[in-house]
């Protein structure tokens, strides 16, 4: 993800640690998805989703006193990282009432604003205490999505990260909650907005955000490889691999984390930019959007294929392909119209040429490139989210970015949204009823999850 917003609800609390509360039972909304075979038969899998611990109520283990309110910690309960983990408990979630999350069969709808809550991030579960893990190599991942109610500045995302399957429960003694309560998050931005990392609080060095009343940045970050299958609204979309030097979740320290949350963007062990394929940015301005060849006024089937050398589940990743299906018609991905950049998929050659054409620093190759991304794809957790962007107003996805750059310069124009339309204050006040719906998730060998004719 090129920029990761400081994602918090007014009830935002803690990630990857602390105790479990008893005020409300945790019941994961059921979500059915399908696993397919090479022969094309697909069988239902009875899964569920869990909301990230960062959205949950965090309170004293002794009573209902908040451990975190607004964007500040309770100094008495959280004087330091270790004490905070011992003193504070996560509690169960009211998915629809508090967070605007509703599941029905194979469909999952995420509302943007529900009362005081803004956005959400959820993980697919294999069972009540384990995230569903996927080996994407030599396979394809397919889902339907409705982005018609996602205006400028919003992002209805579906992506994979190399989280621990149990949310870090077995690794870190301070973590008593685990995947059941949505702990253990990490991504390629090495986010420092997480309240708990590796079983300890992130209170030491915490600085409340200047532009988000519910957010802040702590002394630690949480890093891991990230494969963005879908970052999109009704205007623009991108898919983006983000490799890291390590293949698993690791904790980083301060500005050495790099990414959105640190003073030096490229200081860390991950690639915060990635190698993105945004059709608009690649010169095809009519391919995706309202009334486009891929028309965002109607639901879209999105197919992403991970092609390996030798066509094996353990082969080196050599290409990430994209196919769309809409109205019964298969639509191949748009081809690059940028001079010096060829192709309609993500390959090593595409990424190298794109970085050169756009004048972007090639951090992607520095951290392993496509082959490095492939090494992480054999065990990844699935995430869906809806969010706005307090760092750059989602302009990197749907507008011209950087702000002061000439829109005619290759790579600057990413969508048709005017500057200012995506500001969080604007989207939260003008589009609180925005939403995204994901449905009909399918996973299997390449060619097994959709009909090609």
UniProtKB/Swiss-Prot annotation:
Q: What is its EC number?
A: 3.2.1.91
Give the chief site where it resides: secreted
> Which residues carry attached sugars according to the database record?
284
Q: Where is the signal peptide?
A: 1-17
Q: Which residues form the active site?
A: 226 (nucleophile), 231 (proton donor)
UniProt xrefs under Gene3D superfamilies: Glycoside hydrolase, family 7, domain
The biological processes this protein is annotated with in GO are: cellulose catabolic process
Domain of life here?
Eukaryota
Location relative to the cell: Secreted
Q: Please name the CDD domains in this protein's record.
A: GH7_CBH_EG (cd07999)
Which family does the UniProt entry place this protein in? Belongs to the glycosyl hydrolase 7 (cellulase C) family.
Q: What is this protein identified as?
A: Probable 1,4-beta-D-glucan cellobiohydrolase A
Q: What organism does the UniProt record list as the source?
A: Aspergillus clavatus (strain ATCC 1007 / CBS 513.65 / DSM 816 / NCTC 3887 / NRRL 1 / QM 1276 / 107)
> What lineage is this protein's organism placed in?
Eukaryota, Fungi, Dikarya, Ascomycota, Pezizomycotina
């Amino acid at each position: 993800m090129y920029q990761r917003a400081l994602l918090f609800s007014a009830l935002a609390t803690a990630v990857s640690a602390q105790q479990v509360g008893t005020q409300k039972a945790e019941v994961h909304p059921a979500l059915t998805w399908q696993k397919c075979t090479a022969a094309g038969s697909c069988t239902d899998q009875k899964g569920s989703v869990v909301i990230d611990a960062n959205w949950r109520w965090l309170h004293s283990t002794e009573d209902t006193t908040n451990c975190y309110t607004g964007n500040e910690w309770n100094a008495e309960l959280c004087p330091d990282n270790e004490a905070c983990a011992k003193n504070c408990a996560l509690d169960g979630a009211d998915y629809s009432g508090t967070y605007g999350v509703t599941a029905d069969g194979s469909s999952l709808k995420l509302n943007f604003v529900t009362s005081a809550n803004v956005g959400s991030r959820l993980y697919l579960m294999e069972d009540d205490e384990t995230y569903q893990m996927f080996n994407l190599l030599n396979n394809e991942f397919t889902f339907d999505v409705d982005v018609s109610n996602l205006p400028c500045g919003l992002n209805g995302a579906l992506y994979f990260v190399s989280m621990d399957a149990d949310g870090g429960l077995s690794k870190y003694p301070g973590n008593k909650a685990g995947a059941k309560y949505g702990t253990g998050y990490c991504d390629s931005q090495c986010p420092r907005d997480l309240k708990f990392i590796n079983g300890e609080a992130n209170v030491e060095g915490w600085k409340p955000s200047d532009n988000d009343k519910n957010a802040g940045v702590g002394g630690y970050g949480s890093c891991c490889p990230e494969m963005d299958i879908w970052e999109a609204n009704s205007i623009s979309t991108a898919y983006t691999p983000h490799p890291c030097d390590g293949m698993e979740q690791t904790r980083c320290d301060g500005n050495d984390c790099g990414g959105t949350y640190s003073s030096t963007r490229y200081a860390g062990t991950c690639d915060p930019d990635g190698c993105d394929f945004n059709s608009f940015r690649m010169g095809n301005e009519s391919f995706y959007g309202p009334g486009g060849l891929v028309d965002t006024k109607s639901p879209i089937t999105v197919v992403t294929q991970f092609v390996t050398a030798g066509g094996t589940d353990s082969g080196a990743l050599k290409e990430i392909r994209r196919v769309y299906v809409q109205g019964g018609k298969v639509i191949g991905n748009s081809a690059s119209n940028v001079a010096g950049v060829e192709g309609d998929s993500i390959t090593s050659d595409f990424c190298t040429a794109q970085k050169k054409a756009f004048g972007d620093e090639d951090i992607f190759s520095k951290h392993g490139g496509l082959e490095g991304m492939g090494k992480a794809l054999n065990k990844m957790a699935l995430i869906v989210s809806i969010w706005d962007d307090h760092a750059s107003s989602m302009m990197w996805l749907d507008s011209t970015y950087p702000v002061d750059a000439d829109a005619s310069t290759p790579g600057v124009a990413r969508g048709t949204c005017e500057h200012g339309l995506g500001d969080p204050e604007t989207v939260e006040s003008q589009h609180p009823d925005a939403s995204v719906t994901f449905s009909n998730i399918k996973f299997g060998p390449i060619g097994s999850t959709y009909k090609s004719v």
